[in-house]
Regions:
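Glycine-rich beta-alpha junction loops
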Residues: 1-2, 28-31, 50, 80-88
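Hydrophobic alpha-helical
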Residues: 1-35, 57
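Sec/Tat-exported extracytoplasmic proteins
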Residues: 6-14, 41, 64-68
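Charged/polar, solvent-exposed surface patches and flexible loops
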Residues: 8, 35, 39, 62, ...
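Short, hydrophobic secondary-structure boundary micro-motifs
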Residues: 19, 45-46, 71-73
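Hydrophobic alpha-helical segments within soluble ligand-binding/sensing domains
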Residues: 28-33, 49-65
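Short beta-strand elements at the ligand-binding edges of bilobed clamshell
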Residues: 39-49
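Hinge/cleft segment of the Venus flytrap/periplasmic-binding protein
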Residues: 56-127
Length: 127
């Protein structure tokens, strides 16, 4: 986690305090990163790119059950990152703090939800 190494070096050099005299950002959804955003040590935090695997599995599930995703094109562009606010970080920790066993992607499946016409994948809506 480069941002935390940079923060440590900045503090060790006596150059100031993260979140007060200098701003750091990170791309990470570790507990440390989420807490650092909530405490103000990180000025910006992005994450959520790992959820692309879940979206791919939804599409493969649908394909396996006879619903081809080619109608949306073979190259899908979906937002991979979400810019977290402190409130989003808190919700993320509450919902997924102990793991992703509570993540339910069934509402995104076209097979399980025949009224779904286009995939509406996005990390922010999971919060």
């Amino acid at each position: 986690l480069m941002a935390f190494g940079a923060m440590d070096a900045f503090v060790a050099a006596g150059a100031g305090q993260p979140g007060r005299t200098v701003w750091f950002s990170s791309v990470n959804t570790s507990l440390q990163a989420l807490q650092s955003l909530r405490s103000g040590q990180l000025a910006a935090l992005a994450g959520g790119h790992f959820i692309a695997g879940a979206w791919a599995l939804v599409m493969l599930y649908d394909y396996h059950h006879g619903r081809d995703f080619a109608s949306e094109g073979l190259e899908l562009e979906r937002p991979m990152f979400t810019l977290f606010t402190p409130a989003m970080a808190r919700r993320y920790q509450q919902r997924f703090g102990q793991g992703f066993d509570r993540l339910d992607v069934r509402p995104y499946s076209k097979v399980l939800n025949p009224t779904v016409q286009r995939y509406q994948f996005g990390f922010a809506q999971l919060l």
